[in-house]
Amino acid sequence: MRGLIGALLPVQCAGCRAWDEVLCPACRSLAGRPAHVATIDGGRGPLPLVAMGDYDGPLRRIVLAAKHSARTDVTGFLNEAGARLGIALGGVLGLAGSPAAAVGVPTGRAPSTGSTVDVWVVPAPSSWKRRLRGRQVALPLARAVARALAAGARPGVRVRVVDAVRLRVGATSQSGKAGAQRTVGRMGSMRALVVPGPGVRVVAVDDVVTTGATVREMERVLGGLNAVATLCRPGLIS
């Protein structure tokens, strides 16, 4: 039956358009490379950003397929990429079990004190239409990030995914908007269902970071961020 379906409805690789595979080995391998560490301008100063690469080529097409193609299942890709991002975050935030893994990048909020550190991994909010269709990307990516971050963290670090932010009624899609339009479109567009308490480290996760408008709005409603994780950001890699 699967062969018949494949003959009638052939698939193409989401990344490079090669036939007969949802993701070819070369495109799948993009999720297995180490994440890049950079910074992004937040609303309260620079924030560390970890990303898998540029919003270009196969990686861009994989992200678009994950968001818009009902026939493309890239769950495995998101899980592997999320694991790489989680590993990088452990070093960036100084939470990794090995001190040698720490990376000296500014971390927004002041660090927690005491033996226990609580970390919230918060996905960027999706529209109600995308939630209804089950085409969310940020939420499953956030879950993968949290699993890897928790697995590699030192004792006393507690990591959980908190789906804490929603778009307000009337908020419009950012797709196709220029930079200034994105900034204006995201201002005041979100509300927090719950806010972190004092000392909680907060990581925002989104599939793509472009102008940083979504990050800054999440930072506003949550009261601050420590880091950002994303699949891709334009111009990250020189």
Label each PLM-derived region with a short phrase.
Residues 1-238:
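Glycine-rich phosphate/pyrophosphate-handling loop used in enzymes and phosphotransfer proteins
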